[in-house]
């Protein structure tokens, strides 16, 4: 038995479906023939004629409406068995969402590229979290600065999920500031600040969560004020954007960062698999 795969892209999706189907019949002698990157009428008709001569079953992933119509007419005229893999689910998604499909051949390859960029961004955020390696600052799309408990790490990961490479640096008045901080474009730096009383409550809660006394130097209100003053002075010297996170959620802060730095949200696709 011959199975033809016809695709306007690399044909991996249809080929995998064909392989999965053939695997159910170990005693049948199959021939799998692929016609890929079929993007015009001439190539399509030639592929269909070849399938007809081989008396083949046709599995196709063609997204162009005009080419699908030509294929359907051919199938009907020549009584050739076929299975349209893309059209039914795409049409149903359009019906349910009211959103028209791109109808772009090989679109999933672009989406997969986006997916791997997100993975790369997540790895970057972990690697350069908490000022671990300031050498990464110059590679970052965004550098977050802030005293302890200003949501630097969750913000880094949230923005990384939008394909942005984000590093962050905790600000401690007694600590040395890395030279890379002053080599960065200040337009890529975001200084996070907070209300001292809010920060005091957050730090006390953190101490309680660790089973420690809540009144420590870490949660001391005067120390917090000094830390925030140090941070705000630094932000002024750097000339960077400053965001007060006191009453903001992670999502709200991230949205403000994207808008302030004129960065695009590239998280329009999410998947756990990579196919055609």
UniProtKB/Swiss-Prot annotation:
Keyword set, alphabetical order: Kinase, Nucleotide-binding, Serine/threonine-protein kinase, Transferase
Keyword Metal-binding: no
GO MF annotations in UniProt: ADP binding; ATP binding; phosphotransferase activity, phosphate group as acceptor; protein serine/threonine kinase activity
Residue numbers binding ADP: 146-153
Stored InterPro entries: ATPase_NBD, Kinase-pyrophosphorylase, P-loop_NTPase, PPDK_reg
Catalysed reaction equations from the record: N(tele)-phospho-L-histidyl/L-threonyl-[pyruvate, phosphate dikinase] + ADP = N(tele)-phospho-L-histidyl/O-phospho-L-threonyl-[pyruvate, phosphate dikinase] + AMP + H(+); N(tele)-phospho-L-histidyl/O-phospho-L-threonyl-[pyruvate, phosphate dikinase] + phosphate + H(+) = N(tele)-phospho-L-histidyl/L-threonyl-[pyruvate, phosphate dikinase] + diphosphate
EC number(s) on file: 2.7.11.32, 2.7.4.27
Any single Pfam family the record assigns to this protein: Kinase-PPPase
Enzyme class, first EC level, given as a word: transferase
Family indicated by similarity: Belongs to the pyruvate, phosphate/water dikinase regulatory protein family. PDRP subfamily.
NCBIfam families, alphabetized: PRK05339.1
Chain's role: Bifunctional serine/threonine kinase and phosphorylase involved in the regulation of the pyruvate, phosphate dikinase (PPDK) by catalyzing its phosphorylation/dephosphorylation.
Protein name: Putative pyruvate, phosphate dikinase regulatory protein 2
